[in-house]
């Protein structure tokens, strides 16, 4: 069985996911078979495995850092919020159902057998499991029947490292308070603290580290600097979403819906020379972009109402009426149609009108479509005509069927992992919609779109032919590992790992 170590945090966004990924890469570099694990993740961004199962993206990143194929066992429970009080509960990659927070709180301990089956299975195949907590173990209102922080540490007999974010201020108080709010039994699991996101002179910080150690009698295992490392991380969303500047030759606007999901769909554009990607929430921020993207969402009906009430719907309709391109993905695709119907109350129930930019209607179904797919574009016209015959790959995660109302032809044929074939995508000159997440990741798709947009402006697109996304990601994981090796007492961490509980 594998040895285990766990990273918890004093708060959300303390850097647990990144530190976990970095430790995974370090252990893998040192020759160990390593796997990440998070018993329960709450996120709007998910991933479809090769088996067609759904898991959190943070564990996908950690799996990549471990040189492993993402495996649903790494994240047996995924909660996807559908409203402020309700989440879709996904267990072992399959939908269990929608639950209000109170009902899930009472139910969650029934999932411990699923958690431990997944954990023990991974532990049998690996040398080291790096476990990530969620939120903070100091949330004493959630301590009862905890399955993700100290509760998980006890189940796995895993020593715990507590990370605190000094960039937010109050790191000593948060580390001290987190420790003091644990029971005497739980305190025995905490073997070290980590100061994360530090900027400045370390010598000025050192007296505080000594005082903290004197107070809680737990060593500080390192001070991790604020790092400029490009890794898909939900903790860094605020940095990505805060970009409102249109600094590139091609300006792409993504509508930042309240429940935006799978934001990684647009990462590929951020690596392209001369392209800027902005996330906006107000009509005044729209300006005059070259492309508007309506992204996926975990609550299409609710976010469509928000789009309408915010005034962005009117702005998008005016933009589209000028012949400028709008691209919708998944929930964004559904919004582009004329009508959305929810007879089974998958979301809010009822019927609502869409933007009417595509002659189609969507009916929400109780069963989720969930598959990795390969496809090819055809029957495209207007600004997207250059995509015809291009190949793409991606994945579907949705609970609706979109049907053209006037006999319009679908614009792509999809082949699923099980060999099934179906149609997807609708185009109306400057408007395009698809259910496929990751559709831009195939280089020629993104490059064709950017080349077309540049040609409209009399510019020439020169692709970076030397760029390889897999190589780029691995270099970033290596940079992260190097930074953590320099910042952390890895000898002490290995000792903690080997001694266990």
UniProtKB/Swiss-Prot annotation:
HAMAP family: CobQ. The gene is cobQ. It comes from Alkaliphilus oremlandii (strain OhILAs) (Clostridium oremlandii (strain OhILAs)). One of its GO terms (biological process) is cobalamin biosynthetic process. The keyword Manganese does not apply. Residues 249-445 form the GATase cobBQ-type domain. The keyword Ubl conjugation does not apply. Keywords: Cobalamin biosynthesis, Glutamine amidotransferase. Catalyzes amidations at positions B, D, E, and G on adenosylcobyrinic A,C-diamide. NH(2) groups are provided by glutamine, and one molecule of ATP is hydrogenolyzed for each amidation. PANTHER family: COBYRIC ACID SYNTHASE, DETHIOBIOTIN SYNTHETASE. CDD domains: CobQ_N, GATase1_CobQ. It comes from the Bacteria. The active site is at residues 330, 437. This is Cobyric acid synthase. GO terms for molecular function: ABC-type vitamin B12 transporter activity; catalytic activity. Belongs to the CobB/CobQ family. CobQ subfamily. Pathway: Cofactor biosynthesis; adenosylcobalamin biosynthesis.
């Amino acid at each position: 069985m594998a040895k285990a170590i766990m990273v918890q945090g004093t708060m959300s966004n303390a850097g647990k996911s990144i530190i976990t990924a970095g430790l995974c890469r370090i252990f893998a570099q040192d020759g160990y078979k390593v796997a990440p694990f998070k018993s329960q993740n709450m996120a709007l961004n998910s991933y479809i495995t090769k088996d067609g199962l759904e898991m959190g993206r943070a564990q996908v990143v950690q799996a990549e850092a471990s040189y492993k194929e993402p495996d649903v066992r790494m994240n047996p429970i995924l909660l996807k919020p559908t409203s402020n009080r309700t989440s879709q509960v996904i267990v072992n990659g399959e939908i269990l159902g929608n639950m209000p927070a109170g009902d899930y709180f009472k139910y969650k301990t029934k999932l411990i057998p699923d958690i431990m089956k997944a954990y023990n299975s991974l532990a049998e195949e690996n040398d080291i499991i790096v476990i990530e907590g969620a939120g903070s173990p100091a949330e004493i209102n959630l301590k009862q029947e905890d399955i993700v922080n100290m509760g998980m540490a006890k189940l796995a007999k895993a020593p715990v490292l507590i990370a605190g974010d000094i960039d937010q201020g109050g790191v000593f108080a948060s580390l001290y308070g987190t420790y003091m709010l644990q029971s005497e039994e739980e305190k025995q699991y905490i073997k070290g603290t980590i100061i994360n996101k530090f900027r400045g002179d370390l010598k000025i910080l050192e007296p505080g580290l000594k005082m903290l150690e004197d107070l809680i009698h737990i060593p500080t295992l390192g001070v991790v600097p604020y790092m400029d490392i490009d890794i898909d991380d939900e903790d860094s969303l605020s940095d990505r979403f805060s970009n409102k500047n249109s600094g590139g030759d091609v300006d792409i606007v993504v509508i930042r819906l309240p429940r935006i999901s799978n934001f990684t769909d647009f990462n590929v554009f951020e690596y392209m020379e001369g392209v800027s990607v902005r996330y906006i929430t107000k009509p005044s921020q729209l300006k005059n972009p070259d492309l508007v993207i309506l992204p996926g969402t975990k609550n299409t009906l609710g976010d469509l109402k928000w789009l309408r009430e915010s005034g962005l719907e009117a702005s998008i309709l005016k933009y589209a009426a000028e012949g400028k391109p709008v691209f919708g993905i998944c929930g964004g695709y559904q919004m582009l149609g004329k009508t959305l119907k929810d007879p089974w109350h998958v979301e809010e129930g009822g019927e609502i009108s869409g933007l009417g930019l595509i002659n189609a209607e969507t009916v929400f179904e109780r069963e989720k479509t969930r598959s990795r797919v390969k496809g090819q574009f055809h029957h495209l016209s207007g600004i997207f005509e250059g995509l015809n015959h291009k190949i793409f790959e991606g994945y579907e995660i949705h609970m609706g069927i979109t049907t053209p109302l006037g006999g319009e032809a679908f614009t792509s044929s999809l082949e699923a992992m099980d060999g099934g074939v179906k149609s997807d995508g609708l185009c109306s000159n400057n408007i395009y919609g698809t259910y496929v997440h990751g559709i831009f990741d195939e280089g020629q798709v993104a490059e064709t779109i950017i080349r077309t947009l540049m040609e409209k402006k009399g510019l020439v697109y020169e692709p970076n032919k030397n760029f390889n996304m897999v190589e780029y990601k691995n270099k970033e994981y290596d940079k992260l590992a190097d930074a953590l090796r320099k910042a952390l007492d890895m000898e002490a961490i290995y000792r903690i790992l080997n001694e266990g509980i």
